[in-house]
Swiss-Prot record:
The keyword Aminoacyl-tRNA synthetase does not apply. HAMAP family: DadA (MF_01202). GO terms for biological process: D-alanine catabolic process. Its cofactor is FAD. It comes from Rhodopseudomonas palustris (strain HaA2). NCBIfam families: PRK00711.1. The gene is dadA. It holds the Pfam family DAO. It is an enzyme of class 1 (oxidoreductase). This is D-amino acid dehydrogenase. Oxidative deamination of D-amino acids. It comes from the Bacteria.
Length: 425
């Protein structure tokens, strides 16, 4: 059976790999000249099941106003005359209740934990390397009020048997000795001991090579113009390089998925939320992070990737343009110098932005559509790297008509098409 995967980011490449392992004849098309060159290119580098959380939560509407007014805040909203944006914002606000947050977080932790296990199995199977480390994530709190507010998250971690440690200042320094120089800057932390880190782009490149060795055909520099439907199914995909026809089709185009699906009458609540990162060469090894430190005040992740430090964060809602805004870099620089002063050479940093495909409730959208042969694997938000292997395994099992190893019903598009469509039931 022939399958066409649209998108060669970490989601598309991972899906293609597992499809090929399952015996499908796979083609992947992407507009870029190689794999993982958009959202997967320079993300924060975390594989963080324990930190998987929806952005929509109790108190977020109030915090959002504060963040927008703070020039170093983690949220920027650039108003657009775009009904899709405002529908997405309204849906997100409706998910900002304690009960919805708990439900959505449990769904996200479930797929993320499964994905981490799939990644480990893949690593053992083919020996793939990507500057990976398995030394946990430290969520660092500068204020006591932040530390006091983690009770609900901790209960969900217990529910899913996710190992964690609540640490005082000394415990944080034991986990990340580089913090010793700034020990008065924070009060404590939550350490997620099973979380990992790694270079998502390097992983995507190397898995693409493994998939190609299994017979996957990667077609680059090919822009999709339209998806053509006939008789309740996809009949083909029209591109600037010609028409592609397959038996099954997988949508893995991240933030751009809705633009191609909308003409088919398939409306998915995925909207781009731009993130920024800097990648900094290490100049002082002892002063550098060992793994990932999440600066809870700025919502910034500081991650060790080999001989580099990746600092990623901020959320900019408003358009599909990856343009760099220098004032966003100031926040990233500030977080790094606050917590790991002198660790990296900021004068040699590279600055990047990418579009995260966010759903308003948090979990991704994986599953069938009203077109019989069109499948979705999109909307992973900030957690595409964390969820990639598990999401791909779920999608491939569904395409094989095999029951996935986890309950994936709550990840389907149907959660937006019920009586609670505005919530993501």
């Amino acid at each position: 059976m022939k399958v066409l995967v649209m998108g060669a980011g970490v989601i598309g490449v991972t899906t293609a790999y597992y499809l090929a392992k399952a015996g499908f004849e796979v083609t992947v098309i992407d507009r870029q000249p190689g794999p993982g060159l958009e959202t997967s290119f320079a993300n924060a580098g975390e594989v963080s099941p324990g930190y998987s959380s929806p952005w929509a939560g109790p108190g977020v509407p109030r915090k959002a106003i504060q963040w927008i007014l703070d020039r170093h805040g983690p949220l920027v909203v650039r108003p657009q005359i775009d009904p899709a944006m405002w529908r997405w914002v309204v849906q997100m606000l409706r998910n900002c209740t304690a009960s919805r947050y708990a439900l959505n977080k449990s769904r996200m932790v479930g797929i993320a934990e499964y994905s981490r296990d799939c990644l480990r199995a893949l690593r053992a199977d083919i020996g793939i390397t990507y500057d990976e480390r398995s030394q946990g994530t430290l969520q660092l709190f500068r204020k006591q009020s932040q530390l006091d507010a983690i009770g609900g998250d901790v209960e969900i971690l217990r529910q899913y048997n996710v190992p964690f440690e609540v640490l005082d200042r000394a415990g944080c320094i034991r986990a990340e000795p580089g913090l010793a120089a700034v020990q008065n800057s924070f009060v404590g932390g939550l350490r997620l001991v099973d979380d990992e880190t790694g270079d998502c782009h390097l992983f995507t490149q190397r898995l693409e090579a493994a998939a190609a060795a299994l017979g996957v055909n990667f077609v680059y520099e090919t822009t999709i113009r339209s998806i053509d439907a006939q008789g309740g199914a996809v009949a083909g995909v029209t591109t600037d390089k010609g028409r592609f026809v397959a038996d099954r089709y997988v949508m893995a185009l991240g933030s751009f998925s809705p633009l191609l699906l909308r003409p088919l009458g398939i409306d998915i609540p995925v909207y781009p939320v731009k993130g920024y990162s800097i990648t900094v060469p290490i100049v002082d090894e002892p002063a550098s992070p060992r793994s990932t430190v999440m600066d809870e005040s700025y919502k910034v992740a500081i991650t060790r990737l080999g001989d580099r430090i990746r600092v990623g964060g901020t959320a900019e809602i408003g358009d599909y343009q990856p343009r760099l805004r220098p004032n966003r870099r100031v926040t990233l620089d500030r977080s790094l110098t606050d917590l790991f002063p002198g660790a990296g050479d900021l004068s040699q940093a590279t600055f990047w932005s990418g579009l995260r495909p966010m759903t308003p409730d948090g979990p991704p959208i994986i599953g069938p559509t009203r077109l019989a042969n069109l499948h979705l694997n999109t909307g992973h938000g900030t957690l595409g790297w964390t969820m990639a292997c598990g999401a791909a395994r779920v999608a491939v099992d569904q395409l094989r008509s095999v029951e996935p190893e986890i309950d994936a019903r709550a990840l389907s598009l149907s959660r937006y098409q019920s009586g609670a469509a505005s919530l993501g039931a």
